[in-house]
């Protein structure tokens, strides 16, 4: 009888009152004791409210039943079919929809519905795959930001393929700590391409200069990626090779930095040789087996002499550090290696010395920038800004300071 009166009242009541009453009836249906007849009539009344013309009523019903396991299933699917905010609430919270239903909703629903699905707790992989394939940029962003989503490498790569030019997506992906080496390498390549195009388009740099800078930055990024302990080294090396980043310059840079295990993994991948055998070649005092291995790996003959010299310096540095595994600072290592190479300089090593000198100059500039950044504190910056610069001709030397 109460439900019948509710239905009669709902025909004339304002939308806000109908919404409040619908919410109260839904909560009573879910959480209070009713006999079979009362439950039947209440379910009928709630089903009728799906036909209410007001979205406010639909939203109130969705808020009341979306998270309830005991909710009638036809009410859940009915709210999803209505679309709008009510559908989004249900799609994000309900546990009553199957994976197939969620996939259909992701493929056919609005952007709001897709975003709601992307925000679901522990979103299943098949649903994430559907979103990665067809969802809007906004929904893909929501999926990337959902730390609990069970998305795979293939889904991240597909999103990069579709929306890699969008900075919001790239930034969101960079914030994830669980990305595979392949996704990180692809992301690095896209960012490099975008930056190169930007500086050339603005005429800030020539195309040739931009390509050099991007190549150097890419090498630094690849080295950082390969040294990331969260990633499998073998998988990372394979990804770098696929991305054409496993270059002789990259391997030499890693060697000079003291990343012995990384160099071993690179040469093992390039020559299809077990890591243990490569490590033995690198540790052998005889140069012939090592040079043969380097030739198989595609290392140019003019670069090969740096390997035995760098390995000897690395061993000496490790002995001095009592077996510490920390990488040698680049500039220090280069200085030692250059000193040894220049002692035995011949026609074959001149090109190598020129190459290493250029690398040393870059390392010196990077070191100077880092030291200068560390020396200048915020307080010193504020003090410097507070003192007006002296005009030309007004510079006065402190005689005492000069004499001292």
Give a label for each model feature.
Residues 1-404:
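Alpha-helical scaffold segments
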């Amino acid at each position: 009888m109460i439900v019948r009166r509710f239905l009669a009242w709902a025909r004339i009541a304002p939308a806000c009152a109908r919404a409040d009453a619908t919410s109260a009836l839904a909560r009573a249906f879910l959480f209070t004791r009713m006999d079979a007849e009362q439950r039947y009539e209440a379910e009928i009344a709630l089903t009728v409210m799906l036909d209410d013309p007001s979205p406010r009523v639909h939203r109130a019903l969705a808020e009341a039943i979306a998270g309830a396991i005991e909710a009638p299933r036809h009410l859940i699917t009915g709210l999803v079919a209505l679309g709008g905010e009510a559908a989004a609430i249900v799609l994000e919270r309900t546990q009553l929809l199957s994976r197939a239903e969620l996939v259909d909703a992701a493929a056919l629903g609005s952007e709001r519905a897709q975003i709601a699905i992307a925000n679901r707790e522990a979103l299943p992989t098949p649903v994430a795959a559907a979103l990665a394939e067809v969802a809007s940029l906004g929904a893909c962003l929501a999926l990337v930001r959902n730390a609990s989503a069970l998305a795979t490498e293939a889904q991240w790569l597909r999103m990069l393929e579709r929306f890699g030019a969008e900075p919001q997506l790239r930034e969101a992906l960079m914030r994830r700590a669980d990305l595979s080496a392949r996704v990180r390498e692809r992301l690095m390549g896209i960012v490099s391409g975008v930056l190169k195009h930007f500086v050339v388009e603005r005429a800030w740099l020539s195309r040739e200069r931009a390509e050099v800078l991007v190549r150097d930055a890419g090498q630094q990024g690849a080295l950082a990626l390969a040294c990331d302990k969260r990633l499998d080294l073998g998988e990372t090396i394979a990804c770098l090779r696929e991305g054409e980043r496993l270059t002789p310059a990259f391997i030499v840079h890693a060697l000079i930095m003291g990343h012995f295990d990384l160099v071993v993994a690179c040469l093992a991948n390039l020559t299809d040789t077990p890591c243990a055998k490569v490590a033995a070649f690198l540790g052998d005092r005889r140069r012939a087996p090592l040079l043969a291995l380097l030739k198989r790996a595609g290392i140019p003959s003019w670069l090969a002499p740096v390997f035995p010299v760098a390995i000897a310096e690395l061993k000496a540095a490790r002995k001095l550090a009592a077996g510490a595994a920390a990488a040698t600072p680049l500039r220090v290592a280069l200085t030692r290696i250059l000193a040894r190479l220049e002692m035995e300089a011949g026609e074959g090593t001149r090109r190598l010395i020129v190459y290493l000198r250029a690398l040393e100059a870059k390392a010196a500039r990077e070191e100077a920038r880092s030291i200068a950044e560390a020396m200048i504190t915020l307080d010193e910056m504020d003090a410097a800004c507070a003192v007006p610069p002296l005009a030309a001709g007004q510079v006065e030397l402190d005689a005492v300071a000069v004499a001292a």
